[in-house]
Amino acid sequence: MSIARRTTLSKFLIEQQRETNNLPADLRLLIEVVARACKAISYNVSKGALGEALGTAGSENVQGEVQKKLDILSNEILLDANEWGGNLAAMASEEMETFFPIPANYPRGEYLLVFDPLDGSSNIDVNVSIGTIFSVLRCPDGKQATEESFLQPGTQQVAAGYAVYGPQTVFVLTTGNGVNCFTLDREVGSWVLTQSNMQIPADTREYAINASNARHWYDPVKRYVDELNAGKDGPRGDNFNMRWIASMVADVHRILNRGGIFMYPADKRTPDRPGKLRLMYEANPMSFIVEQAGGAATTGTQRIMEVQPTGLHQRVPVFLGSKNEVERVTGYHDEAK
């Protein structure tokens, strides 16, 4: 691809704005700011030990998880990049207990930004792919946000995306009109369109789940995974391979490219906690992307994007990816009711 013929993220968004007329200018600018922040995060991640940002920060987030130094730095990068642009009413993050209203000395906009600044951060110190996940909603109260303003089902998202910081840095985006992938050209500092209208195959031979938790799974998940593991001699009559990176962005990106099902179910260890992944800034944006790519995403009993949130840090079980596999495991949950 010659440099002259490359489609950058900025050009792509402007063309979308012109052609479909459903991408408001403020939303386009917001996406570009988030993408620039992801470039900055990528730079800090790539420095590794040379940047003195590895290791823990000696603090915990609202989830009770030990924060890595890069968790905090990535959160600050996203806040600093987005607070002054005039496109947002407020932001919310995995790393903050409450939402972050745009300071009064900056102009406010009509959008809400929700993000996991560094997903898979347990992999930071061992140099495994990690990433950033984000979701954009409209503020129902205009430009004056409250916590309740954020509590919208995923069907109300106007944009969602993620960045993966791996061998290449990629930025995957949907605005409700398909899924596209951009790769960071570090030499010129721009995001270049490298995959258009991504589609997840309906059938798959790969699945992603943390099998070390198998003894804690509920029966529908046990049944489904046991069938996969039985291979050609089992009821599925085919061999399946398990893949698990322990980084949602990396696992989902693989599925987006070659099919598969990602599962993070609820289990018996914490019956009062429905799953581990957070609805607002992990499950919803990934579900939006997966559905736009022809896949499916459920909690096992309900379409994820139809779940009505009750809190910023609400957790849900997650089954997403190739449509036929998600429908199968969801059907097993229905049968078990």
From Swiss-Prot:
User: CDD domains of this UniProt entry?
Assistant: FBPase
Question: Which GO terms are recorded in the biological process aspect for this UniProt protein?
Answer: fructose 1,6-bisphosphate metabolic process; fructose 6-phosphate metabolic process; fructose metabolic process; gluconeogenesis; sucrose biosynthetic process
Where found?
Cytoplasm
Which keywords does UniProt give here?
Carbohydrate metabolism, Cytoplasm, Hydrolase, Magnesium, Metal-binding
* Binding, substrate: 119-122, 210, 276
List the EC numbers from the record. 3.1.3.11
Q: Which GO terms describe its cellular component?
A: cytosol
> One Pfam family name from the record?
FBPase_C
Q: In which pathway does it act?
A: Carbohydrate biosynthesis; gluconeogenesis
- Superkingdom assignment: Bacteria
Which cofactor(s) does the record list? Mg(2+)
Q: Where on this chain does Mg(2+) 2 bind?
A: 116, 119, 282
Q: Which PANTHER family does the record cross-reference, listed alphabetically? A: FRUCTOSE-1,6-BISPHOSPHATASE-RELATED, SEDOHEPTULOSE-1,7-BISPHOSPHATASE, CHLOROPLASTIC
Entry-linked HAMAP family: FBPase_class1
Instruction: Quote the subunit structure annotation.
Output: Homotetramer.
- Put simply, this protein is called Fructose-1,6-bisphosphatase class 1
Give the species this sequence originates from.
Answer: Burkholderia cenocepacia (strain ATCC BAA-245 / DSM 16553 / LMG 16656 / NCTC 13227 / J2315 / CF5610)
Q: Which gene encodes it?
A: fbp
